[in-house]
A protein has these predicted regions:
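Positively charged, low-complexity intrinsically disordered leader regions
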Residues: 1-43
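Histidine-anchored nucleotide/phosphate-binding helix
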Residues: 58-77
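Short internal beta-strands
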Residues: 77-85
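C-terminal functional extensions of proteins
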Residues: 163-271
Length: 271
C-alpha cells in the first residue's frame, strides 16, 4: 500500500508506468530497501541536492526527505551526516544537522541518495527537460561505495537520479528524453516515487512498521518549517522554478495531506 501511495502521479510524468513495470521486477522493493536501511543505521551518509537550470538553483524536493531520514537514523540509535550544496546547508543551518564536508566513504555503513543527479551514459548530468546541469559529482561516492561493498540506497522520481541506473531500460522506455537523461549509476536498493521526498517518507513509514514505532508522525509540522527555511533562502520548486511553498508543483497542503494518510497507514499497522 505504501509503495502505491508514494507513486501517486499527480502531474502525469509517467512515473506510474515506470513504477508498475519496476514492481514486476522487484515487487518488494520498498521492503527490501527498508531491511537494508534498518540493518545499516550505525553511520549513514545522506546525500541530496538537485540544481534546476538555467540558474542552477537547488530545488525543494530532496532536502526535506533527507532531513526526515536524518532524524529517523537518530531515533534508531545511529549517527547520520548530510552531504549537500552550500545553499541547502545555509538554509538548514538552524536545524541541528551534522553536515559532511569531505566525507571518507570507508567511514560509513550506508549511503542514501534523495533526489541527487546521477550521470548519464555520456558522463553529463541532465534535468528532466534534458538541459545540462552543473553539479558536484556526489554520485562518485556511490560508485566508490559499490566498489567497496558499502550498501547504497537511491531515491528518485524522474530517471536522472543516483540509483536509476538499476532500471535505465525502463527509464528510456517510459520517461521523456529518457535515453539522454537516464542515469547509469546503480545502487543496491532503489526506491522510485512520484516525488522523491515521498520516497524518503515511504521508507520511514515502512521502517516504522517494521520496528513497531511511528517515526513519521511528527514530520508534517517539521516539513513545513523546513520548506519555509528553504524558500526563505531562495531554494525553488523544481517545476514552477519559483521560491514558493511547494514541491514539484504540488502545494504544501497536499504534501501535508499525503503525510496524514501515510501516518494513518502506519498507525493502523502498528496499532
Amino acid at each position: 500500500m505504501i509503495a502505491h501511495l508514494i507513486n501517486t502521479d499527480l502531474y502525469g510524468r509517467n512515473i506510474i508506468r515506470l513504477y508498475l513495470e519496476y514492481r514486476e521486477r522487484d515487487f518488494d522493493f520498498l521492503s527490501n530497501a527498508t531491511s537494508l536501511f534498518l540493518e545499516n543505521v550505525d553511520r549513514v551518509l545522506i546525500v541530496s541536492c538537485f540544481p534546476i537550470p538555467p540558474m542552477q538553483i537547488a530545488e525543494t524536493d530532496g532536502p526535506p526527505g533527507a532531513l526526515a531520514l536524518y532524524r529517523t537514523v537518530e531515533k534508531l540509535g545511529g549517527k547520520a551526516e548530510v552531504l549537500t550544496c552550500k545553499k541547502i546547508q545555509k538554509a538548514l543551518k538552524d536545524f541541528k544537522i551534522d553536515f559532511a564536508q569531505t566525507p571518507s566513504i570507508e567511514n560509513y555503513s550506508l549511503l542514501i541518495s534523495v533526489e541527487t543527479p546521477g550521470r548519464a551514459k555520456d558522463g553529463n548530468y541532465y534535468s528532466m527537460s534534458a538541459l545540462e546541469i552543473e553539479v558536484s559529482p556526489f554520485d562518485e561516492l556511490f560508485l566508490k561505495a559499490r566498489e567497496l561493498g558499502i550498501p547504497t540506497i537511491g531515491i528518485g522520481d524522474g530517471g536522472n537520479e543516483i540509483g536509476m541506473g538499476n532500471i535505465r531500460d525502463l527509464v528510456c522506455k517510459h520517461i521523456k528524453f529518457g535515453e539522454k537523461i537516464g542515469s547509469v549509476v546503480k545502487v543496491d536498493s532503489l526506491i522510485i516515487s512520484a516525488v522523491s521526498n515521498w520516497g524518503a517518507y515511504g521508507l520511514i513509514a515502512q521502517a516504522s512498521i517494521e520496528v513497531g514505532k511511528n517515526m513519521i508522525k511528527s514530520w508534517s509540522k517539521e516539513e513545513e518549517k523546513v520548506l519555509k527555511a528553504l524558500v526563505s533562502s531562495g531554494v525553488i520548486d523544481g517545476v514552477t522554478k519559483k521560491p514558493e511553498l511547494s514541491v514539484d508543483g504540488i502545494p504544501l497542503e497536499v504534501h501535508k495531506s499525503f503525510l496524514t494518510l501515510l501516518n494513518s497507514i502506519v498507525e493502523n499497522k502498528i496499532g
